[in-house]
């Protein structure tokens, strides 16, 4: 009897084990089911300059699918929006634009992403091209990309939308204004509304100083140590020269930061190695900002831009001055994290107010509590690296779905504060 029970137990365990392994194999196989297709393209930007691009489309169906162009944020950005240190031994960097493209293409959209001029994968830079780039070049590049997207056989040229993030929120409205018959909708994420000069001062002087005084100087001594600065991801890149910043991004060696700071503040620390916030940190932050805004820098920061770029950027009319020129038939979705330290949520409120003032009939603002510039949980002081939250992606898709003819459903955001225009095509109920 006991032997029979033992055999039954063994057989039962064997069946259970087999079932578990089958479930695991099925789950593993599910991960490799192809839901989207990729096609690499080359965009001719003119004057002998070309850049790589990639189109993602649903794996099933011939289309034509509604098209989406993603316009990236500031700095040296490849088509994936690669964020974070890029080096052999470090963690995988984030790729937020690839994340958006995959999400939308799995659900029925053809999405085009492209490298900025002079930029290749993993922050490889053609210094001659990148160092002479201006915001006007980037606007024209986006127009070229829209034309390429519209020509793809899988894309319906009558249903094209643009997603712009950060700096892309400066470019996208201008492309929409100049291509009003092609661009049906724009999605602006991490919004720039007012003067670029004022926004950069906030980013590089006002907010860092407030952070140092309220967070790092816990004892209210007016002092901070070099060790504290070298460990702080926001402060260290604002205070050190761009050459040191670039070396750090390539090596992820914090000693590079510490050594650079010690040279900057040589003979300016007290016995304990502390420096004055008011007399050392503040003047250096202002000096870095003035060097940038005066266009007097003789050396380019290849991670960001050169003076030729900032000169053109600062002369650009703010979005508040041009947003009223967008066609009334163009749908506008505004998205902003409430803890965004680079493009504060107040920027989004201003743009929404302006759209209301000019009686734009189809716009909606969604703000997300606790999310930062990358639409990931962040403090109000600095951007935390992480993937875009799924409910943000769901909001983008739902709105585009309702505005691209994929469904007749009304748009209802998931997990945010919503402020909508009076329009029959949107759900006007506020959620929180």
Task: Identify what each model region corresponds to.
Residues 28-63:
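N-terminal cap/lid segment of alpha/beta-hydrolase-fold proteins
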Residues 61-64, 68-103:
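Short, surface-exposed "cap/lid" segments of acyl-processing enzymes
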Residues 131-152:
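Alpha/beta-hydrolase active-site loop
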Residues 148-154, 158-205:
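Primarily recognizes the serine-hydrolase "nucleophile elbow" in alpha/beta-hydrolase
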Residues 189-325:
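Accessory cap/linker subdomain of secreted extracellular hydrolases
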Residues 334-336, 340:
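Short beta-strand/loop motif that positions the catalytic acidic residue
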Residues 341-347:
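Conserved alpha/beta-hydrolase "acid-adjacent" motif
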Residues 380-420:
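Catalytic active-site module of serine/aspartate enzymes centered on a nucleophile-bearing elbow/loop
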């Amino acid at each position: 009897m006991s032997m029979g029970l033992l055999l039954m137990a063994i057989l039962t365990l064997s069946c259970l084990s087999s079932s578990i392994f089958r479930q695991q194999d099925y789950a593993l196989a599910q991960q490799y089911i192809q839901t989207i297709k990729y096609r690499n393209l080359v965009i001719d930007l003119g004057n002998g300059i070309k850049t790589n691009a990639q189109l993602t489309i649903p794996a099933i169906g011939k289309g034509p699918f509604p098209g989406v162009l993603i316009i990236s944020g500031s700095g040296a950005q490849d088509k994936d929006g690669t964020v974070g240190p890029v080096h052999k031994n470090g963690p995988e960097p984030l790729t937020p634009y690839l994340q958006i493209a995959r999400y939308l293409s799995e659900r029925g959209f053809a999405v085009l992403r492209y490298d900025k001029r002079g930029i290749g994968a993993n922050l490889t830079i053609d210094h001659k091209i990148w160092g002479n780039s201006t915001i006007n070049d980037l606007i024209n590049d986006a127009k070229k990309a829209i034309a390429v997207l519209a020509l793809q056989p899988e894309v319906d040229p009558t249903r094209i939308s643009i997603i712009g993030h950060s700096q892309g929120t400066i470019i996208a409205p201008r492309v929409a204004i100049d291509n009003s018959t092609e661009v049906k909708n724009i999605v602006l994420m991490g919004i720039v509304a007012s003067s670029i000069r004022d926004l950069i001062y906030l980013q590089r002087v006002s907010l860092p100083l407030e952070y140092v005084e309220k967070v790092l100087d816990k004892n209210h001594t007016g002092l901070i140590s070099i060790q504290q600065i070298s460990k702080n991801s926001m402060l260290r890149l604002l205070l050190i020269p761009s050459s040191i910043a670039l070396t750090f991004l390539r090596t992820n060696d914090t000693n590079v930061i510490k050594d650079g700071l010690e040279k900057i503040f040589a003979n300016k620390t007290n016995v304990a190695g502390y420096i004055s916030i008011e007399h050392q940190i503040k003047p250096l932050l202002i000096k870095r900002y003035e060097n940038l805004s005066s266009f007097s820098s003789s050396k380019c920061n290849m991670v960001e831009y050169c003076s030729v770029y900032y000169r053109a950027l600062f002369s650009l009319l703010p979005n508040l001055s041009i947003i009223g020129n967008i066609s009334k038939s163009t749908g506008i979705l505004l998205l902003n994290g409430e803890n965004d330290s680079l493009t504060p949520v107040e920027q989004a409120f201003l743009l929404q107010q302006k759209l209301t003032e000019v009686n734009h009939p189809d716009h909606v603002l969604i703000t997300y509590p606790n999310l930062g510039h990358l639409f990931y949980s962040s403090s109000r002081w600095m951007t935390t690296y992480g993937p875009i939250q799924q409910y943000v992606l769901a909001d983008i898709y739902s709105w585009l779905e309702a505005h691209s003819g994929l469904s007749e459903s009304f748009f209802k955001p998931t997990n945010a504060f919503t402020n909508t225009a009076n329009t029959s095509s949107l759900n006007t109920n506020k959620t929180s």
